[in-house]
Amino acid sequence: MATPDDPATPALSLSASNSSSPTAASSVPPPTGTSEIQYDDVAIIGMSCRTAGGNDSPEKLWRFIMDKKDASGESPSWRWEPWVRRDTRNAKVIEKTISKGYFIEDLENFDASFFGISPKEAEQMDPHQRLGLEVTWEALEDAGINPQSLSGSDTAVYVGVDSDDYSRLLLEDIPNIEAWMGIGTTAHGIPNRISYHLDLMGPSAAVDAACASSMVAVHTGRQAILAGESRIAIVGGVNVCLSPALFHMLGAAGALSPDGVCLSFDEEARGYARGEGAAILILKKMSHAIMDGDHILATIKGSAIAQDGKTNGIMAPNAKAQELVARKALKQAGINALTVGYIEAHATSTPLGDPTEVSAISAVYGVGRPTDTPALIGSIKPNVGHLEAAAGAISLVKAVMAVQKGIVPPQTRLNKLNTRVDWAKSGLHVVRESTQWGTEDSPRRAAICSYGYGGTVSHAIIEQFAHAADPFTASTSDDNHPTLLLLSAPQGKQRLPAQSAALAEWISPAGAHESLRSIAATLATRRAHHENRAAFIVSSHTEAAETLNLFSKGAEHDSIVQSRTLDNNINKQIVWVFSGHGSHWSGMGKQLLQNAVFYRTVAPLDIVVVQELGYSAIEALKTGRFESSGQVQVLTYMTQIGLIQLLKAKGVHPHAVIGHSVGEIAASVAAGCLTPEEGMIIVTRRARLFAKVIGCGGMFLVSLPFAEVLAELGGRTDIVAAIDSSPSSCVISGLNAPLEEYVEKLKNRGIRVFQVKTDIAFHSPMLEVLSKPLKESLEGSLNPQPPNIKLYSTSQADTRHPARRDAEYWVDNMVKPVWLRPAVTAAIEDHYRIFMEVSTHPIVSHSLDETLAENGASDFTTIHTMKKEQSAEKCILHAVAQLWTKGVKIDFKFLGRQWSREVPKIRWSHKRFWKEVSTGSASAQTVHDPDKNNMLGQRMVVAGTNMTIFTTALDESSKPFPMPHQLHGTDIIPVSVYVNTFIKATGGKVLSKMELRVPLAVTNDVRNVQVIVDGQSVKVASRLSSSDDMSWVTHSTASWENEPSANVLPSLDVSSVIKRIGTRVSETFSVDYLKKTGVSGMAFPWAVNDHYNNTKEMLVTLDNDPEHETMSWDPCSWGATLDAATSVGATLFSREVKLRIVSHIDRLTIYSSDPPPKRYHLYVTEASSSQVHACSADISVLDLSGTLLARIESIRFTEVEATPTKSTSIESGVHQIAWVPARLSEKPLSLEQIVLVSEDDAKLEQYANELQRQAPKIVKLTSAAKLRDNGALFMREKNATVIYCPGTVTSLEDVASASHRFIWEVATAIKFLVENSISAKFFVILDRTFLAGSPTALAQGALYGLARVVASEHSDIWGGLIDNEGPLFPVMPLKYVQDQDITRYIDGVPRVARMRPFTKQQRYAPSTARTLLPKPEGTYVLTGGLGALGLETCDFLIEKGARRIVVISRRDIPARSQWSKASENLAPILERVKAMEKTGASIYFVSLDIGAADAHQQLLFALERLSLPPVLGVIHASGVLEDSLLVDTTSDSFARVLSPKISGALALHKAFPPGTLDFFVLYSSIGQLVGTSGQSSYAAGNSFLDVLAAHRRSQGDNAIAFQWTAWRGLGMATSTDFLTLELQSKGITDVGRDEAFQAWEHMSKYDVDQAVVTRTLALEADDILPCALLEEVVVRKARAQDQSAPASGNASDSSGRPTASADLKPWLDVKIRECVALVMGVEDIEEIDTRVPLSDYGVDSIMTIALRQKLQSKLKIKVPQTLMWNYPTVSAMVGWFQKQFEEGQ
């Protein structure tokens, strides 16, 4: 029997990252034209470039050079505009600056989404980095290296760069600097970004050697390869010219061409022209390149770098140094200079540079040559300019092209050779026209020169690589066979059509000379494989072009397979499913037999068939005549075995297998249990026995579930349910007559029935007669082995049962039911989602789809290998294509080794990304002087009018007052600055009818401000400078007069007023009152020295800028004095604590012509008009003798509306935790299986007994480790409930270790449930923990904080923590309290935590002596005292009277004599300590790990040695923060965080027992109350502190735990954007240092053990409550008055939510993408691929919080912190929100 010819088979791997055996290289003959290959040479295997003139590839650049084109032109004017606007002096200079050069068009464009970079980050990236990324990707594709294959490799990246224009543009705009600008604007960011995005682990460095940078980078990369540091090196350079600064400098130095062109070697050369561009080359050792099948463009024979030493000037060229570095490179290469035919010169076109360089080149390469064969020289610079840092690399690209093509291109812009060079004697010739470059006896060689103006000289020698015949060339016979062309793209499928069109355009006719197979191999093995994929099954170039064009136009075709890969978190391993009887058709084997792999596989099996049955199965396949069911099964098995090998030959391998009926035999072969021959023995011997039962029975597919049919048939044996096919169908089997009768009944009931093509009742009792003969015939013929991959049984009810595939198994397979649905379900439960039916026609694929859908698998695929009457070859390729487009890894070696560099490369999808900087800091624009405390900038008189306008720009850099003056967190211009502005603008002394309309905010955004004096009126107006179309806002208006009326009030008798008022109040009275109203600070520094006050009048003595002898601002300014007047004046109305601001002044008069004094009096009385406006005052400013200096009449203070919280007083910033009755769910939790975990045997038994009536199945375990190790075996129920009950602790000594153990038990259980995707609810049951009455309660206390974080990170798993205060198991809260993190079960009532204000009833009685404040006579112990919060606490204690503080720290503090030598980190801390000690306090240090086992003893010993007065107070502020999600934590990381919190607190508890101190203060955190994700360990430690405080107070101690919010700018998590957003997402804010200590003092009045210190944010009327804890304290803004108005763009989006389920998903898709686009800064939501993880778009942690807030606001549903972690794509989030809405949450 003839065997088909074997097709060519690839011999080597095509992956660039996979090396073949070392012997492969030696089998390749040396290239022709060389005497010998130096395998240690470094090969250039790929390159790409970008230059002016639209040259975006080496080929385009070559044509450009050959055509003598040049790309010189003007710099785009918009680039220099920011510098023009930055300083008024710049414009004239820039006008005279040379602006011509060689510029890349559309430099601002970048394909950010391709690299997963967000628009916001992209605009903060230097174009150097953008060019570097794109050109590197192009170069790797040119090299035939899949960039993704380099991940984790030692690939080196060296990139030359020496300009930072974009960095200066962004970073000199200081107020607008953002986080990403750091890495985005650095030089090292260029190579580092390449390494980062490609996940490279080799060296990565920027090289700056001026204009030699890129050649130094090439040399360094070559050295890295030769040294064995890196297998591949990415080298080159990038240059961008954005700023006029360097143009101006170079022009001034005479280095630049006035005409903006390079005239290398020309007599008229007068300087160089700057050029933009990038060139990247890919290097690899020659031996590796040959082994890997790379195309070698040239070899680098030698390279050298040096410095030219001390010359006439550091920038002067040195011919001797240039000569020496060339000779060094030649020596290294072992090459005679006379064999180098072409030199690519540096040739900068400078009068000195060109002659100097030519003399050096002549000395090396020209001298000694025959006059008729001079060395040829040229330079690329007249074509594309001097690319400076990239100059050497672009020259190298040109030289490589010349060496490859055998042509020396012509020199551009050469009219007359430079006469300073003696060309006749030089041995050199400048090529004016393109010249053929042929050599007979040696390869073409070229030299490249590159020099830096700082003195760096570099040189390289390259050599032609003449390609040998490829021994692995694919057979031309393959050209008519179908093959696969693969295209892929990241971030949205919209890229694919453009790629397809480009490939179609090239493939015919341009690509016709390339074999279709080599094109396919290029795309499959040497290009990246992204998420969006399309595969094309084609047989010719013409068909390929047509199919690709169809796809590019959006058409569908059978030859096109398109899909996005399955999500990253989905298992992409394949399950092969071998179907059983019924897939056969007459022509199924005819084409398959033409395939050599198939034929070789089945030929040995045909021998077995002939021996066993007496006929040839191969002949039967050829004829297509199948005479019996037995023969069908033989041929079915044979084709399946052939398909196994055929699929493997196509690079497809299974990871699990399932067999259906007779398909189980082939499945067992695929799994390695049987040999193919053993399988055929089973099939043939069964077939022989089937002759006894043929024709007696049959089978039908029925559209009813298996269980239903089984019940309906009862115990019948004549008809049975034979195959459990899918959730809605099964196959019945039986004797013909009763089967037909039953089927007829089913049809009459309207049930669909289909006959199976068989005359045997398989899987029925009818075949039991064959059982014994079959078993006997197989015994001794089989040697079954264990499977080598996952194998599911369909012959066993337990489909995972590892039954041996022996004779008895195959009897069961023949007689017993087929459990296909359970087997597929088991595979689904084991996370398989890709199923391939291995058969000649699909018969179970529908059942697979149905079972997958039934099991909730939303992202899956089923694929079949062949289909009836269709080309087998194309069907199999179609299946391979389907697998690949779903993300399955396919080994494409079958496509061969040959590949093509000409296949079109990446098509970029460019968009503009450019950071629009402000016009510069406002203070740089000849604007107002902030120290004069006014807003008067440039003055302009409007012609023909009585109007004068002062214009200025206002931002934080030009704030006209020295200190923060905030309203609702934003600085606003104080009234005193308006007054000072009006006085100075008009020159008047009187202002009247002054209105304060709208606050003028001072922010980073520059505002244009106008002060307009129009006749006798004056006003201030502003608008944002970036919004020219925005209308002007008027902030304040007034009328003015020149001089006051003659009616001057007499001097005030100050002593008489003081006597009349009588009452003297604290100097801090005014400041304290203003703080209560929420005013955190004054606009100017002033202090009250004396304050006399009653309800009608005040006399106050003040000092401006009290810490200085003279004031630190313009002495003529009334700003500070009037700020004090308006601030202190407001306190006349202190009867009610309300925030008020000045809204109106009737009249303000300045009487004095002298500057205001530093010290002065204020006299304040109620205004006579106060009956109309209750809060109006008259204020007089007097000097110390009582003389009137200024007077404000009827200044009106108006209450501020819509303050962000109920009140800004300190009372509103402290809260208690109250426990309110929980809302009960109408639907109880379903308890199908309960797993009890506890180390307490007695509790385990008690709870198990009490729960017996609640759940049918209860499992008891003594540890979470046992759950982890064995849980997967018994936790199969969908509604499992895991309950953890920590044990009992009897001794205080065991509390710390038990606490850690309890925490880790919970962590272990949660990790197990998450990692195994088990659907369960997890509960923790505590025993009176909140009451804190025992060591058990203390040890369990840490679980409170842990519970809230787990609830946040894993809300789908978390059932709740129930703190049970009753004797029985808390069944009721377990079942009916849902979606709560913690529940206390008290007297049969479940209660949950809510924040509430403290009540007066909680205060101490007035006679109580307890306090939280220090006394001078005591000693105070402070842990964590050297941290940010600790130092502030130390300062506060000293402020309040402490004189001795002992600071406990793990740091070793040097002796005071050594403090001057302290480390950089420690020195500022010690300086702070010294400053505090200057107040008279003493600070002592004890170096101690407070978490150590014997810490309390060490502490007491240390205190004893210090011999200080008794310790009266302890503050425990120590802590360690290690943020990590619970599933990523380790026991050790928990221990590090818990040690200072739990062990440290216990050490202090032991050292200072309850009742021995005045106070015991613990620093806890609000993070554990609101469930801050990532802080499970920190939260656990802090909640322990809460319980310890309660424990001590229950024993009579004055202990309190402060549950602090973040302290603004302080602590372990300073107030960054991330922290601010995180707090806002919880509905809370940070507090300032002073607010925190005000809270401390305030709580000194209360008899409580805990205090939550935070402020809440105001919510919109319909906003979702961000945290249930805030339910009773949050303030909601009033609804808009017109609720009946039609919804506008600002109306609630959720109001339009569709009610129909079908419409909800697309609606959610749009809404979520709108939110994502808003956060990312993307204009078109279509740019957001719903299947791409948001992290791939560059969404970082800050954006994640912002997105969560946007989603919560738009969709009006609470969004968990972990949503974007657990549901990382838009598609996944749509599913989550849809579920929430449909469940009515």
Curated annotation (Swiss-Prot):
Null mutant phenotype: Does not induce any observable growth defect but impairs the production of both mellein and O-methylmellein.
Polar residues biased stretches: 1681-1698
Residues in Ketosynthase family 3 (KS3) domain copies: 39-464
Record region (C-terminal hotdog fold): 1062-1206
Top EC group: transferase
Pfam families per the UniProt record, alphabetical: Acyl_transf_1 (PF00698), KAsynt_C_assoc (PF16197), ketoacyl-synt (PF00109), Ketoacyl-synt_C (PF02801), KR (PF08659), PP-binding (PF00550)
Region (Ketoreductase (KR) domain): 1418-1608
Sequence intervals crossing the membrane: none
Induction: Expression is highly induced during plant infection.
SMART domains membership: PKS_AT, PKS_KR, PKS_KS, PKS_PP
Active site: 211, 346, 386, 661, 965, 1123
EC number: 2.3.1.-
SUPFAM superfamilies on file: ACP-like, FabD/lysophospholipase-like, NAD(P)-binding Rossmann-fold domains, Probable ACP-binding domain of malonyl-CoA ACP transacylase, Thiolase-like
GO biological process, one term: fatty acid biosynthetic process
Cited InterPro entries: Ac_transferase_dom_sf, ACP-like_sf, Acyl_transferase_dom, Acyl_Trfase/lysoPLipase, Ketoacyl_synth_AS, Ketoacyl_synth_C, Ketoacyl_synth_N, Malonyl_transacylase_ACP-bd
Domain Carrier: 1706-1781
Recorded GO MF terms: 3-oxoacyl-[acyl-carrier-protein] synthase activity; fatty acid synthase activity; oxidoreductase activity; phosphopantetheine binding
Chain positions covered by the region annotation Malonyl-CoA:ACP transacylase (MAT) domain: 575-888
Sorted UniProt keywords: Acyltransferase, Multifunctional enzyme, NADP, Oxidoreductase, Phosphopantetheine, Phosphoprotein, Transferase
Span list, region N-terminal hotdog fold: 933-1047
Pathway(s) annotated for this protein in UniProt: Secondary metabolite biosynthesis
Region (Dehydratase (DH) domain): 935-1203
Domain notes: Multidomain protein; including a ketosynthase (KS) that catalyzes repeated decarboxylative condensation to elongate the polyketide backbone; a malonyl-CoA:ACP transacylase (MAT) that selects and transfers the extender unit malonyl-CoA; a dehydrogenase (DH) domain that reduces hydroxyl groups to enoyl groups, a beta-ketoreductase domain (KR) that reduces beta-ketone groups to hydroxyl groups; and an acyl-carrier protein (ACP) that serves as the tether of the growing and completed polyketide via its phosphopantetheinyl arm.
Biological role stated in the UniProt entry: Polyketide synthase that produces (R)-mellein, a secondary metabolite that inhibits the germination of wheat (Triticum aestivum) and barrel medic (Medicago truncatula) seeds. Condensates 1 acetate starter unit and 4 extender malonate units. The nascent pentaketide intermediate then undergoes an aldol cyclization and is aromatized via dehydration. The (R)-O-methylmellein isolated from P.nodorum is most likely to be derived from (R)-mellein via an additional methylation at the hydroxyl group. Interestingly, no O-methyltransferase gene is encoded in the vicinity of MLNS on the chromosome.
Protein name as annotated: Mellein synthase
Source taxonomy: Eukaryota, Fungi, Dikarya, Ascomycota, Pezizomycotina
